[in-house]
C-alpha cells in the first residue's frame, strides 16, 4: 500500500492546515510595504529577499535603485528594510532623528564582550563611549600619534623598494594590509609588530583570524533569518568573534596596562594610553566616566575590525586608480614634491593640507565605499516620508548606489578627482556622499583613517610610480563579498622614482 492511500483524510487536512500556517508564519510581515505601495523584489517565505545578496550587495542595490526609484522595500528574513535615497530623508535618519528614533545599528548576532565596542553598543552606553573616546581623535592627539605611524610608512617604503628591485609585480592588498595591520595594532595595543617581515607573529595571526568574517557565514545567516536565535546562542556561549582571539587580546591589554602602570617613564601617545588615561583619571572607577578593562579591550579590538579592511582596501583601490590614470598620478606626485622638496619627511600639517591628495582620496572613497550600506534600526513605530515603519525595522541607505547615481555625479563610473576641488566640492550634497556615514553616529575614526591613508600615499608617491601589468584587471571588477572588494587581487608594477630617500 502506498503512502498516499495509507493516510486518512483527517491526516491530509491536518497536514494541509499545517503547511498553510507555516507559510503564513514565514510571510507574516511581507505585506508591510506592498500595502503602502512601496515597490521591491518579491520576498520568499522565511528567507525574504536575502538570496539576492549573492549577487553582491553593491550590485543588488544598484539594480533595485534603477528598477524601483528612490524608495524600495526589502526583507532580511522577516525583518523589513526600507531603502531610502532622498537626501532630506537621509538627513532625518542620520541627524535629525538620530537620538530619538534611529540611534542604533543592527544587531548581527551574539558578540560576547564586543557588545561593549562603540560600533556595536546602543543608546546611553554608546553615548558614553562616544563622549569618552571622541577626545582621542582630536587633531592634537592625532598629531602626537603621527610619528608612531610614520615609522611604518618607512618600513612600507623599504619593503616596496626591495620588491621593485626584483622587478616582479606586487599584490597590493598583501603589502598594504600589513601596513594597515601594523599601524592599527601599534596605536590600539601599543605593540610594535612588523607584519610585513614577520607575518607569522602570534599577534598578527590572532588579528587575521578575527578578520575572517563572511557575510554568508551560517551562524550570521541564521541570525539574519531568525533574530530570536541571538539570545539562544548567547546562552550557549556561542560568539560571532573567535573566542581564542578575543581572549588573547584581553590578556594582552591586561599585560600592557600593568606594564605601563608599573613603569615610571612617560609613555607614547596612542589609543591604548588615551583609553587608560580616561580610566585612571576617573575619581570613581565604576562611574560612567571610566572605561573598564573589558571596555578598553573591546574598543581596541573593534579598531582592528573596523580599520584594517577599510584602510588596506581603500589604499589598494587608490593605487589601481592612479596606475590606470598616469596623468592624475603625476599631478599628485608634483603636489607632494612641491610640498616636501627633496623627499623631506612628511609632517602632520603638510599631509593634511595637500589639496590634490585630499581630492584623490575622496574620489576613491566615492567610487569604492568599502561599506556598501548604512543601516539604522527604528526604536519605535515611526512614519518616514509617509511610510509606516514598525519598531525593530531597519532603514537602509545604499551608499554605493548613491555614489554612482548619475543624477548626483556626472560620469559616475569615471575616476575624476576634480569633483572634490575647492570650486566643486561646495556643490556636493553631504547626504549623497557618505564614505564615513554622517551625523552623531558617523565613523569616529574618520580623521585617523584619513591621516593614516594620506601619510601612506605621501610616502609611497614620494618614492614610487605604479603601472599596470599583465596581471592587472582593467577595468576593475568587484566581488560579491559583503564588504567592497575587487574580484581579483589588485596587482601592479612598482617603479622606483629617480631619487632615493635616505634612511628608508
UniProtKB/Swiss-Prot annotation:
Induction: By dexamethasone. This is Cytochrome P450 3A11. The lineage of its organism: Eukaryota, Metazoa, Chordata, Craniata, Vertebrata. Highly expressed in liver. Its EC number is 1.14.14.1. Heme binds at residue 443. It is a peripheral membrane protein. Its cofactor is heme. It comes from the Eukaryota. Keywords: Endoplasmic reticulum, Heme, Iron, Membrane, Metal-binding, Microsome, Monooxygenase, Oxidoreductase. Its main location: endoplasmic reticulum. The gene is Cyp3a11. GO terms for molecular function: heme binding; iron ion binding; monooxygenase activity; oxidoreductase activity, acting on paired donors, with incorporation or reduction of molecular oxygen, reduced flavin or flavoprotein as one donor, and incorporation of one atom of oxygen.
